[in-house]
Amino acid sequence: MTKSEQIAHLYAQNVVPTYAQSMVLVKGKGTRVWDADGRVYLDFISGIATLNTGHCHPKVVAAVRDQAATLMHVSNLFYTEIQARLAEKLAGLAGGGKCFFCNSGAEANEALIKLARLYGKDKGRFEIISMVNSFHGRTLASLAATGQTKYQAGFEPMPQGFVQAPFNDLAAVKALVTDKTAAILVEAVQGEGGIIPAETAFLRGLRALCDEKGILLLCDEVQCGLGRTGRWFGFQNAGVQPDAFSLAKALGGGLPMGAIVAAPKVADVFQPGKHASTFGGNPVAAAAALAMLNVIEDENLLARAAEAGARFKAGLETLVGKYEHVKAVRGVGLMVGLVLDQPAKALVEALRGMGLIALATAETVVRFLPPLTVKDTEIDEALEIIEDAVAEAHGVERPHDDEEG
């Protein structure tokens, strides 16, 4: 057996088979990862939008080491300075608000749902309007808010109080608002749904609708937040301010970390005992998060995400029209989807075989989520691999500069 086969065998014997793993990774640095058999890959999924500052950024690693050597965990029965500093930083980036810390995106969205219900309780408001094709997590309430029945199958009956409207359809959302509506929950970019950005007019219309009806606008920033779209938060591209929003994935710099940031009038309904997390805001995870945020600022990675995303999208767009099965490119910043007219899984597997890691989503979309630190040379290398794989799928052999003729 190879080393990879040995580890895969251990998984088969000892780990619940909820994931369809394909390779054993043992090392990461920047935009590259190494498997157990020594092969190197360009990582264009970043732990699913988690490693915005790349694998093992030295400043994040140093922050984790220093904090782990000082204080690892005390629970939220006590104050810690590192959590306070992180909350101050996030609130400042968000233009104000208060934070609640947890451990994942699903937990953060559960917190948003509980916050909205508690805020609306005195008026009998409990219902959440979310979007068709959305994804908000795998715990039962976040799953009920998710607008994709394939994830709910087998777990019925779903918790009540959730309805879905078509994404980017303001009239459809308005038609669902009742005197029981507590909040509208929306992603600025639907990631799991196929890299579909919210239209500016749609997000602004939701903000106006919520103001008119006295309900909360909640944004799920778990995948699109923290610089991935070229702004700190995806909703900022539309110039709107939600009443509360969720964060996770990239927040911990590679460690488990989730959070919500809520306007004070909303946040203050979470009084002692109303919600809690033993590990939320753990000092080591908080140190990693604060270091990650500082790296994004110090290395100007918001601008880098916008510039690198434009370069990558421009390269992908040359494939549209050139190859029959490539139909569109969409996304914002470094959250990019290559849309096919056939299942994307085969192309993703071909890319991996050529040394590039990507993801299939929404059946026909290849999803790319490279670190914000990705270099132009790495983007160009990825584009070469992608066109090689696409050409091969079309039965076309591409000439290369190093080939004769």
Residue ranges and their predicted role:
Residues 1-405:
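Conserved N-terminal phosphate-binding loop of PLP-dependent enzymes in the Aspartate aminotransferase
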